[in-house]
Amino acid sequence: MDTDALEHRFLEGDQRALARAITLVESGYPEGQELLKRLRGRLSAKVVGLTGSPGAGKSTLSDRLIEALRKRGETVAVLAVDPSSPFTGGAILGDRIRMMRHHGDPGVYIRSLASRGALGGLAGATVASLSLLEAFGFDRILVETVGVGQSEVDIARVADTTVLILTPAAGDAVQAFKAGVMEIADLFVVNKFDLPGGERVVQELKTTLELAAAHPSGWKPSVLTAVAPKGEGLEALLEALDAHSAHLEERGLLESDRLERARFEVESVIQEWGRRRTREGLVLIGRVAAGQLTPEEAAQQLLGLPAGRLEGVSD
């Protein structure tokens, strides 16, 4: 692999080079890390996280956002994080199929990443891929997560603006309240608002937000409505996204967002390294199950530590 040639094509705006670079990073090749080192921090895009329960219409909303942003002259990239099979590691890469109508538009790039067991709903390579997309020069990057739940708050650590998408479906809003994901959202969108119960969900959200503690950044989250297949509510959503971006700039919060993203990326690398070492240590785990090793001894061998040097284990 000629890293110099790939970097040159990348900087020339060749999307095939971008795709190759992301593949190298996602697969863990050293060439991918070398490219990241050379390209990180070149440009900064507006990063929007889209999260919500399965069936909330995230992909349809993403598709319509691409259309609306392109009409404004913005270039757009989408990272759609798909669920992985717990057995094969394969992903159901359906999001990209829904948005294939934008294929051929040089101002649009869509990529699906498999979550591969990432607890926060984000693939381990998501932030690294995000850095490559920024270096490529996209104006706006949409990151669509697997779903929503107690562990899926990682999106708020990656995105500048986090959009929580709900529907009038019974229990959808209540589940969001219980799961604690209310705190991660900068904007709320009740999609499929034309279905029965839409107004009820909007009122529930507004009431809950009025009682909630003030947002740390001083931002007051908005509750919006949309019917994504018809394009309804898209203009209001774009205005709200612009308003939040302006708020971050005025308060000087973009730098802290980037710092939090870097912290998340380092933590993700450490977690992925740990998962990889665990897979490599299946033999040791088998020996623990057979009573031949203690868990501490197995962990010491996995980490390459001398006996008795595993910190954090009680005496």
Feature names for model-found ranges:
Residues 2-56, 62-151, 155-173:
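Nucleotide-state-sensitive switch-loop elements of NTP-binding domains
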Residues 4-9, 15, 50, 54, ...:
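Expand to "…catalyze enediolate/carbanion chemistry for C-C bond making/breaking, isomerization
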Residues 6-7, 113, 189, 222-226, ...:
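Short hinge/gating elements
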Residues 92, 129, 154, 158, ...:
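Alpha-helical scaffold elements adjacent to nucleotide-binding pockets in ATP/GTP-utilizing enzyme cores
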Residues 140, 161, 186-187, 222:
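Well-ordered beta-strand positions
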Residues 168-196:
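Flexible active-site lid/hinge loop adjacent to a nucleotide/diphosphate
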Residues 187, 193-247:
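Canonical P-loop GTPase G-domain recognition
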Residues 225, 236-310:
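Long, well-ordered amphipathic alpha-helical subdomains in the mid-to-C-terminal portions
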